[in-house]
Amino acid sequence: MPTARQALLDAAHRALDEGPWRTVRMVDVAAVAGVSRQTLYNEFGTKGGLAGALLRRAADGYLAGVDRALTAPAPDRPAAVALWTVRAARQDALVKALLTGCWAEGLPRPEHRPGPRGRTAGRPPPTPEELVALVRERMVAVSPGAAAGRCEIALRLALSCVIVPVPGDDAADSRALGLVREGARVAVPAGLSGPSRTAGGRSPR
């Protein structure tokens, strides 16, 4: 059985699927979740706090998918992460916005203003640079040496597909995945080292 917090986040996400964030009302979110409005405010403090928690959950879910992709056989890991990145961004506009920093009309945005905070307000959602760095760190940790370079290239190519999506369904994703594999292989031939440490904090371009 979901906790009150999980139920509230689920209700908020459903409300976002049905209309722009600016029209989402806290009282309606609480009603759909089956909890009191006071419980909602205790958890998140403000509507901005709810938005931040929704964004953090989207980021955490995306990173959990990255971890699953990295359980693939070593040669397939860069492509598996790339495919997950493209699909996750296509399926969830919040993930796409978190990865690219491009916030479509109607999406909640991170807020950094001081104000009331719920008892579990927690950390702010990651910036695109921070989120990509977390993915890169995970990829490099399980792919030492030249494979780290292929991970870097695969991630950059995947983000390019997120910014300019390939039209179509899973078949189109598979074609894009083939391009990612080939691009990573050509860009970082066997025997070359991984990306420079000094480049670790830079966002893909």
Predicted features by range, described:
Residues 1-32, 49-52, 57:
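Basic, helix-initiating cap at the start of DNA-binding domains
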Residues 11-18, 61-69, 156-165:
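Solvent-exposed, amphipathic alpha-helical segments
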Residues 33-44:
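Short hydrophobic/aromatic patch on the recognition helix
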Residues 46-49, 94:
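Residue-level recognition of oxygen-bearing side chains
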Residues 56-80:
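Amphipathic alpha-helical linker/stalk segments
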Residues 79-205:
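An extended, acidic
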